[in-house]
Amino acid sequence: MAGNATQLLLSAHAAEIVVHALFGERGIVLDPAADLQRVRLQSVKARMDADLAYPWSIDELARNAGLSRRSFNQKFQMAYGESAIDYLRARRLDAARDLLIHQRLSVTEAAFRVGYAHPANFATAFRRHFGYSPSRCQRT
C-alpha cells in the first residue's frame, strides 16, 4: 500500500514538473493568486449578468471581487477588453433590445427592466450603442 502511495506522489510531482516546464518556456506564469482573481472577476461578471436592473457601482463590484476600485477596473479591463461599466451598459442595452423586439415592451418598460431610471437616458445610450432609436425596434 505504501508503495502505491509513493508511486502516486512521484507521478504527481513528475506531472507538476512537466507542466511547469511546458508552460514556463512559453512565458505562461502559473499563479494561484491570479487564478483566484480570475474566478472572482468571473463571479462578479456573472452577478452583473444575472441582475442587470440592479444599480451596480464600481465600489460594490470591486468589493465583491476583493479588490480595490483601481485594481478592479484594471483587471476587468485586461480580462474582458472593456471596463465593467461599459460591459454592463452593453449587456443592459442588448437585453433591452431583446425585450423590445421579442416581448414588445414599451421603451419605458424596457428601460426600467434593465436598470435605467430615466427613459430619456436609456434612449440616448441605446442610440449611441446601436445607431438607431429604441422605438425603431417596436416597428420591426
Regions found by a protein language model. Name each.
Residues 70, 120, 135:
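Key DNA-contact positions within bacterial/archaeal DNA-binding proteins
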Residues 81, 115, 127, 131-134:
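Conserved phosphate-binding and hydrolysis motifs of nucleotide-dependent enzymes
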